[in-house]
């Protein structure tokens, strides 16, 4: 069972139909929407400020979500994928966003809807990623505008797939090959 810890009188609020891996950690002032998933060794730490997450947010293995004391909460919209080993800290991420594996999004950043932060990128403090942009690099910069194919083929596909993956883990006593119809 995941570690869900009350801190300073604040208990995480977990949305309906959410999957929490056994080694996931959720602490303090955290509010999650429905159909979210928090995977193995991911940490969501609402200890020094609050964290809100919309519906269909997946926080993949080893990701770290945190906020900044007395300055920046972490606000995440709907249909957001946060890749393996990513760090998302004290920023705002709107709807339909993919934050790639190992990416870092720092304090006071704004990532608008329908955007992608490429794997391994570092979005430095105070950066504003506008809607429909793809950013990458260290420090991250705009690479291009997002296409419909990229939005549907990556951002939406990954978010939807993680809802499906989490259903596999919620089904007790069934073999994955039976669930997948293999």
Listing of model-derived features with the role each one plays in the protein:
Residues 14-58, 62-68:
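A positional/architectural concept
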Residues 81:
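Short proline/glycine- and basic residue-enriched helix-capping loop/turn segments at helix->loop/beta transitions
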Residues 1-13, 47, 53-55, 61-64, ...:
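Glycine-rich hexapeptide-repeat left-handed beta-helix
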């Amino acid at each position: 069972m995941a570690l869900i810890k009350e801190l300073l009188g604040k208990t995480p609020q977990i949305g309906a139909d959410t999957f929490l891996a056994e080694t996931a950690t959720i602490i303090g002032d955290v509010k999650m929407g429905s159909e979210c998933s928090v995977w193995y060794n991911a940490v969501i730490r609402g200890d020094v400020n609050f964290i809100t997450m919309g519906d269909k947010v997946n926080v993949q293995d080893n990701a770290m979500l945190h906020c900044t004391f007395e300055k920046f909460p972490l606000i995440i919209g709907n249909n957001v994928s946060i890749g393996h080993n990513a760090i998302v800290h004290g920023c705002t991420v709107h709807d339909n966003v993919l934050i790639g594996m190992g990416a870092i999004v720092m304090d006071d950043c704004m990532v608008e809807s329908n955007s992608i932060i490429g794997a391994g990128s570092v979005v430095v403090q105070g950066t504003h990623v506008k809607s429909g942009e793809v950013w990458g690099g260290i420090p991250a910069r705009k690479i291009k505008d997002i296409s419909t194919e990229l939005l549907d083929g990556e951002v939406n596909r990954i978010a939807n797939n993680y809802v499906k993956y989490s259903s596999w883990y919620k089904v007790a006593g069934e073999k994955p090959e039976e669930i997948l119809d293999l």
